[in-house]
Swiss-Prot record:
Protein's GO biological process: regulation of translation; translation
Function in brief: Binds directly to 23S rRNA. The L1 stalk is quite mobile in the ribosome, and is involved in E site tRNA release.
Phylogenetic placement of the source organism: Bacteria, Pseudomonadati, Pseudomonadota, Alphaproteobacteria, Rickettsiales
This protein's name: Large ribosomal subunit protein uL1
Keywords: Repressor, Ribonucleoprotein, Ribosomal protein, RNA-binding, rRNA-binding, Translation regulation, tRNA-binding
Gene Ontology CC entries for this record: large ribosomal subunit
Family: Belongs to the universal ribosomal protein uL1 family.
The protein's assembly and partners: Part of the 50S ribosomal subunit.
GO molecular function: rRNA binding; structural constituent of ribosome; tRNA binding
Signal sequence bounds: none
Pfam family, one: Ribosomal_L1
Keyword Membrane: no
Gene3D superfamilies hit by this protein: 3.30.190.20, 3.40.50.790
Length: 217
């Protein structure tokens, strides 16, 4: 979140300035950083959730599904990249690494998946009812995730970092994704927070400076 915070831009202006200033010789990511007041709250709450980016991430989102029988068939038909049952869990225990962004499971698999929670958890892959990833509606959930759903969580400083695309996106597409993320985070305001919740919103590219967005904090 580096950069000169004394100058603020509208979201549209900030994104356009960001794209014009990106000079790296690779396709830089574009990220939004949202500074929240949760780090200062006595409860030490963290904010976590998921949001579908209207314009996607600009790359394939990969999904693994733990299911069997008809549910496994539904997941495969919906486009899941990896589908497995107890055998897959055993392979993960033995060191197989899942090259995916999300894991989904049917409810009956959760007791077995708990055995690999220490493997999936640190990578943010543990199925979670809060994200809709413990479900029998596998085809629907695979479709939602594939359309560009991303997870987010505030860090210990109360900052939420979310990738909203890359410098190959149009300003309009980045703006749509930006607005979706900000709205999702604002919608999770804890009732325990008094006064200001969003203290500042910034956009930046991987190697570029950050731009403070006016009217969002």
């Amino acid at each position: 979140m580096s950069g000169d915070g004394s100058c603020s831009y509208s979201a549209e202006e900030g994104i356009r300035e960001l794209l014009q200033s990106a000079k790296a010789k690779f396709r830089e990511s574009v990220d939004v950083a949202i500074k929240l007041s949760v780090a200062d709250s006595k409860s030490g709450e963290s904010i976590r959730g998921a949001v579908v980016l209207p314009k996607g991430l600009g790359r394939e989102v990969r999904v693994a599904v733990f299911a069997k029988g008809e549910h496994a068939k539904q997941a495969s038909s919906a486009g899941a990249d990896v589908v497995g049952d107890e055998e897959l869990i055993e392979e993960i225990k033995k060191g197989r690494r899942l090259d995916v962004d999300w894991c989904i499971a049917t409810p009956d698999f959760m007791p077995q998946i708990s055995a690999i929670a220490k493997i999936l958890g640190p990578r943010g892959l543990m199925p979670n009812p809060k994200f809709g990833t413990v479900t029998l509606e596998l085809a629907e959930m695979v479709g939602i995730i594939k359309s560009g759903q991303v997870k987010f969580k505030s860090d210990r400083y109360g900052i939420v970092h979310v990738k909203i695309g890359d410098i190959g996106f149009t300003p309009e597409d980045l703006l749509e994704n930006f607005n979706a993320v900000v709205a999702a985070v604002q919608g999770l305001r804890p009732t325990t927070i008094k006064g200001s919740y969003v203290r500042g919103v910034f956009v930046n590219s991987t190697m570029g400076r950050s731009f403070r967005i006016a009217g969002t904090g």
